[in-house]
Amino acid sequence: MADTQVVIVGAGQAGLAVAYYLRRFELTPGADFVILDRGPGTGGAWQHRWDALRLGSAHHVNDLPGMSELGLSFDTADRTLPAKDIVAGYYRRYEDHFGLQVQRPITVSRVFDRGADLVVAHDQGETRTRIVVNATGTWGAPFVPWYPGMADFAGRHLHTSSYSSAEELAGQSVVVVGGGTSAIGFLLELEGVAGELTWATRRPVDFRDESELTIEGGVAAVAAQDAAARAGQALPSIVSGTGVPRTRRIAAGIDRGLLVERGMFARIESDGVVWDDGSKTRADAIIWATGFRPELRHLAPLKLREKAGGLTVASGASWQDSRIFLAGYGPQASTIGANRAGRVIARQIMAQL
């Protein structure tokens, strides 16, 4: 017999959105459904973001469904405070207001079959359930591409997930790798703090003026994510479809020569990186702003991954196992996508119960 009807793994924007709608459909938090979250506190991945990130400089954060009942909105939040603190605080009040009873910190290690049910194994035991909603996002699966000599580097390898503040790199020579907004944010923050900055990208950065940032372009990028998910393919990056907005701050950085990419280095040596032409740049640290992959290792026993590299998912539901839903996967990864998907997934769950 199942311990609960639904287990939601992850209490970020996607997990909380599903929980909100399950509660609206009169399921009881902590009984009919339980939420297991690995984080030490509220906020999902936001609680781990770097100190200098502000809501005004981050991708737009949409409100969770029902947040207006608390009189809260990220649109009116204080943009002088760290984004990590604002999001964590708002999510804490949200969980309390709706009585979601999130259990944390609990780390899920695997999900497997037991008869007709699923078992969610975690560091505090096992929970047997009829349905699992995976809402683990990507923060726990940072992606760092391999380059020759990586293991020989005597300096520090940092990733977006481990970067804390510019001060820890004061006076050092830093190479930032990546062509997205995180890489640009690091360069802007490190300017005047690091001793020397170099920007490495695999391809030229696609800067776009505001007039080029259309709704159609955003819809097309999300559609590409959806098509890949439905085909069971590895998910493309969003920035590859939308480009990077040329804001005033970014345009100024380009004009003064800060935001000028050099291309990609060929290999890494103990004290720096070597380029295709044989020239070398000394480095004390390399920041890999190279993105994340969906965190799905705990689902491996269910053998959902396709040969094409992804999971076959449509409207948040696994095509291979009707008991598995993936909130925040592919086209649902943004905050607005996660909110809409929460309602869609909750309705499908109710149809099964």
Where do the model's predicted regions map?
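Flavin (primarily FAD) cofactor-binding/catalytic cores of flavoenzymes
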Residues: 2-40, 44-47, 52, 79-353
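Redox-cofactor-proximal catalytic regions of oxidoreductases
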Residues: 41-70
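Short, basic/glycine-rich phosphate-binding loops at helix/coil junctions
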Residues: 63-73, 228-233
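Short glycine/proline- and charge-enriched loop/turn segments
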Residues: 68-74, 154, 306
